[in-house]
């Protein structure tokens, strides 16, 4: 019988701190890392690089099935490697984002990327960052964490992040956008944003990131021991 590599899934809403937590867990455990939120952007960039017709589901499916992508946690930063090239910044452009939205509309593309995400499950283990990792992608994962925080706290974090990059942002507008996205994510008919029944729910509203990492790491090590 084949023994599957263990998986730690980290799900939760935008701005809860999933990315930071997953990078820390991957570095601490020396495990593989999957950033599911970046997968569609990576596919979009690959399509642009290879001049694949983004409006053609038939053209996108083979590209999605064989997407050559790796995620590397290094010194607290996430590197996205597409076909051996660091595209961490390139996938964040508006053009790539728009293309990613188009690609995500195709059911067979989503199915191909679901299989591709599951292929990240390799020894010694995988840290999977997303919204439906514990409920849809890896329902048999031994360690599931749902990281949450109040909408106000997440808006505050996002505002400070954007201000640090030199952007002038409005808190109320950010808060409204986050609440709208939460409503969409939690009420969608397919893979809604909900904690898995067996997930540890961590509310990071009143916690520092170091406290979140320590709690999650202790929980993972306890389950995996």
From Swiss-Prot:
Binding residue positions for ATP: 12-20
Cellular component GO terms held in the UniProt record: cytosol
Matches recorded under CDD domains: CMPK
SUPFAM superfamilies: P-loop containing nucleoside triphosphate hydrolases
Gene Ontology biological process terms from the UniProt entry: nucleobase-containing small molecule interconversion; pyrimidine nucleotide metabolic process
Keywords (A to Z) from UniProt: ATP-binding, Cytoplasm, Kinase, Nucleotide-binding, Transferase
Gene3D superfamilies per record: P-loop containing nucleotide triphosphate hydrolases
One function term, GO molecular function aspect: CMP kinase activity
Pfam families: Cytidylate_kin (PF02224)
Locations listed in the record: Cytoplasm
Main location: cytoplasm
InterPro entries the record matches: Cytidylate_kin, Cytidylate_kinase_dom, P-loop_NTPase
Regions annotated as coiled coil: none
Reaction(s) the record says it catalyses: CMP + ATP = CDP + ADP; dCMP + ATP = dCDP + ADP
Enzyme Commission code: 2.7.4.25
Record family assignment: Belongs to the cytidylate kinase family. Type 1 subfamily.
PANTHER family per record: CYTIDYLATE KINASE, CYTIDYLATE KINASE/PANTOATE-BETA-ALANINE LIGASE
Annotated NCBIfam families: cmk
Name this polypeptide is given: Cytidylate kinase
